[in-house]
Amino acid sequence: MNTSFTHPEFADHERVVFVNDKAAGLQAVIAVHNTQRGPAIGGCRMWPYENVDAALTDVLRLSRGMTYKNALAGFNSGGGKSVIIGDPRTAKTPALFRAMGAAIESLGGRYIVAEDSGTSPTDMAVIAETTTHVAGLESDSSNGDPSPSTALGVFLSIREAVSFRLGRSDLLGVRVHVQGLGKVGFELAKLLVSNGAVVNASDINDDNCRRASDELSIRIVSNDELLTGNCDVFAPCALGGVLNEWSIPTLNTSVIAGAANNQLLTQEDDLRLANAGILYCPDYLVNAGGVIDVYHRRQGNSQENTDAGVTAIADRLNSVLTEAQSRGISPAQVAQERAEDLIRGPQNDPIPTVAA
């Protein structure tokens, strides 16, 4: 196994913590990538990783992406992530999440956790029994689930990218392939259908497919058909690494914009997409709606602040796409430059809030 320092995904991470609590059945990795702008915020993913090295690879990549995501959103926060090795369908126990909370508490506030793939607001409530450094909890005004905000940000980004690339002012008849029908993917498909898009989708979970077919009347296809079929927009909303040297030559789309993190398997895949004439909208820009939701609720800000923050994603994307076009470089390069400039610069003033 690679050590943290020699791991190919290690990118000057500040802290990488391996957690092993046998009594609680917990094996986890917490990665704090950068706290230049403030405490690291990022979700806790639970997944049945094949081994610890796979978990380490994922958490290192995800935490770096959170640094960029939070910087572009203008937050006084850095990037971090945590992963629990285990099947979320069978391995969840209160003891496991309490142990995870204790591990997070030991970092002294450097990392603030929230839900992610495989975890829920209910799990965050158990984590909160042993740490105060948790966001995305249920309240009187919110169920704690940020996925609708994530889906809305992706939807607005798709609409913006379709306008930019295809010159369309609406989504009527636009063909969108949605990969993944979990909480975010389903909400995205729902928004797309309600705005006239023609949606095909795939998911490894048969129940998710049946629900989407029954409730949204969308066409369910195989993952291979989804990747290779002709469409206007491909929206990856499952796990990362789907855009790679093997899949990119098979894609038949004009735009890529989705909710999945780490959609590019390598940095070279951005160039492959550009050479293929495909407009790739950087994932950490497009899918920031969830962390925007979590951030504003933790700050005690109003729903209007969250709504304004999510809506601003489309404007930010347009700015990135316009600059990329004028400079003859990819949108991912522009987004990375902007994020790194923000990370190197002084911490922002507190985000202005909208009166409730």
Where are these regions (language model features)?
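N-terminal ligand-binding/catalytic initiation module
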Residues: 1-140
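Buried hydrophobic packing segments
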Residues: 59-62, 154-162, 291-295
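Flexible, glycine/charged-enriched surface loops at secondary-structure junctions
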Residues: 70-75, 110-115, 166-174, 223, ...
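Hydrophobic beta-strand scaffold residues
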Residues: 111, 199, 220, 279-280, ...
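Glycine-rich phosphate/diphosphate-binding loop of Rossmann-like nucleotide-binding domains
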Residues: 145-233
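Adenosine-phosphate binding glycine-rich loop
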Residues: 162, 254-355
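Rossmann-like adenosine-cofactor binding region
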Residues: 206-285
